[in-house]
Amino acid sequence: MEIYKITTPGEWTYFAKGNANILFKYTGSNDYLRHKLLRVRLLKEDEQYISTCELYDFIELKCKPLFPHQIIDIQLVVLTTDFVNQLNNEGNKLMVKERYGLLLPNILDGDYCKQFLSRNCQLYIGTDTTVQEAGVNRNTVPEKLQGQEQKKLQKQEQFNNDIDSVIFEIKPKWLYDNISSNYCRTCSLNQLRGFQRHFCPLDLLYEETIDQGLDDILSLIPQDLLIEISETNKIPVKQLFRIFLNNPNNVFQKLKEYQRINNKNDLIKNITSIYDVSQNLSLVMTLRDVGLFIKFEKYNKYNNIHNSHNNINNLINIEGYGKFLLTCNIYDLDLKSKLKYKHWLDTEEKLQSIYNSSNPDWRHCVKVHDNTNNLGT
């Protein structure tokens, strides 16, 4: 689709950006584009650049067969240099010579308040009507507001309308059976970067540690907000999350399965050049950096999406609370450049002193007995 023929750059506003892409939100009146985001590539050095066409093929041919129900639908659209140049890029440099962009649904479309929890976990609270706030945009609660100041702000903008949905945005990172290390790869990297502990993604994989993992995730939600969600609005977040994780085919288990290294040549420690980076390793490294939107939503019998055939198996009834729709979407499937192997090696070298260390402020990660000849990470 030649998107520049049905819309103008002025109808797209800056929404968010990552390391490789920038997102624009549609604000015009075209029904087809409403509730959509346009993903455009940020400027990269030519040798590290992966074209949008190559990325699109990678997602459709390599990733979607693995996660046919979780990966959001994307559409390849044709751009022009003039169109890209006129986008409100908020000072970011775009890859203006790239002829293609990606059109995708806006999972956060609607009235959501963002609650920053940690680098790899955000919370979004959705209400059924717009809440008017004095000088505060509900979609962009400042992350710098913490502690008492943040609680004060929350009380001032208390939810006067019913909360009908909760979304967790999580980057699960590396998922595998930790055999012997005190800290998993993700927790080790977070310590290396100087972050405070929030949760260990490995806890979400095993029945005996799920509750601990969920308690850790929920621990950074202000208590009054958690009560507002779980008790006042009767969305039993922990119970819903546990039901989601107890499904043996949940997305965390699937990611763990497809991140598994089955060939010793694909172990990062064995890579010596770009020629050692196989297609399988590129896929694995992509899956180790994806993001998830996990949504718990009150069932609405008048909502056609809730009643669709695709969601028959996603409806959960909880006694005393009612019926809920549980959905999960995967995003951020960026094919990794083979040139990143140097960065991977450098990072692994820095992590060696952390894997088996003991940090009094960081609980050791779960260890499991392995009977499957696991080659490691």
UniProtKB/Swiss-Prot annotation:
Q: Name one GO molecular function term.
A: inositol-1,3,4,5,6-pentakisphosphate 2-kinase activity
- Tell me which EC number(s) this protein carries: 2.7.1.158
What keyword terms does UniProt attach to this protein? ATP-binding, Kinase, Nucleotide-binding, Nucleus, Transferase
Question: Where is this chain's protein located in or outside the cell?
Answer: Nucleus
Q: Name one GO cellular component term.
A: nucleus
Instruction: Give the catalysed reaction(s), semicolon-separated.
Output: 1D-myo-inositol 1,3,4,5,6-pentakisphosphate + ATP = 1D-myo-inositol hexakisphosphate + ADP + H(+)
Chief place where the protein resides: nucleus
Motif EXKPK motif per record, residues: 169-173
Q: Which GO terms describe its biological process?
A: inositol phosphate biosynthetic process
Q: Name one Pfam family in it.
A: Ins_P5_2-kin
**Entry keyword ATP-binding:** yes
- Does this entry carry the keyword Transmembrane helix? no
Q: What does this protein do?
A: Has kinase activity and phosphorylates inositol-1,3,4,5,6-pentakisphosphate (Ins(1,3,4,5,6)P5) to produce 1,2,3,4,5,6-hexakisphosphate (InsP6), also known as phytate.
Domain notes from UniProt: The EXKPK motif is conserved in inositol-pentakisphosphate 2-kinases of both family 1 and 2.
Query: What PANTHER family does its record include?
Result: INOSITOL POLYPHOSPHATE KINASE 1, INOSITOL-PENTAKISPHOSPHATE 2-KINASE
Q: Which family does it belong to?
A: Belongs to the IPK1 type 1 family.
- Name of the molecule in the record: Inositol-pentakisphosphate 2-kinase
**In which organism is this protein found?**
Debaryomyces hansenii (strain ATCC 36239 / CBS 767 / BCRC 21394 / JCM 1990 / NBRC 0083 / IGC 2968)
| Gene transcribed to yield this protein | IPK1
